[in-house]
Amino acid sequence: MSKYGDVVVISLNHRLNILGYLDLSPFGEEYKNSGNAGNADMVAALQWIHENIANFGGDPENVTLFGQSGGGMKVWTLMQTPAADGLFHKGVVQSGCIDHFVSGNSAEQNGKAIVTSLLAELKLDDVKALETIPYAQLAAAYNKVAPEVAKTGAYVGGNPLANDWYLGDPLEVGFTEHAKTIPV
């Protein structure tokens, strides 16, 4: 892209699955926004871009997000995330849809079912102990329990949890005032 136009292209990463979107809120206030860790990573990256893009010849007041499929969906979710307001100004959604995200009680029930299974698989007594488990071991445990937990309808994907961090599915709650100003 930058070869063919006067643009600075930055790619960002974020946590996915149980590291990025597992709702641990039923286990305490400290986990209130655990189901939004992946989106929080993207907001942190956008803050860094806003503060540093000029050093690379970019304009912090002219940032366009783009994504394909799940990445396109992330553009929509960031439009509903107040912490991202003003950090990007346009969006390109390539084959990404506004999906009806799991929220509220369903997300809590999913999180509780998955965590209960993980704790049993890892022979742990407390959700706090999950924070000390190496990623490879945690992922292996999740892969082992996920098929059985999925039979109950519980699922962790790449969607944020609707709360005060992410305001929710715009098809249900409407777009935020800021989102209405972003050309897509």
Q: Can you annotate each of these PLM segments?
A:
Residues 4-10, 59-63, 84-90, 180-184:
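Loop/turn elements at helix/coil->beta-strand transitions in domains of secreted/extracellular proteins
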Residues 14, 68, 90-102:
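Active-site nucleophile loop of the alpha/beta-hydrolase fold
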Residues 1-43, 47, 51-55:
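Cap/lid segment of the alpha/beta-hydrolase catalytic domain
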Residues 58-61, 73-75, 88, 124-127:
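Short secondary-structure junction motifs
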Residues 72-84:
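Short glycine-enriched nucleophile-adjacent loop
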Residues 49, 56-69:
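Alpha/beta-hydrolase fold nucleophile elbow
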Residues 85, 94-184:
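Substrate-access "cap/lid" subdomains that shape
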Residues 20-24, 76-78, 101-106:
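Short, solvent-exposed loop/turn and secondary-structure capping segments
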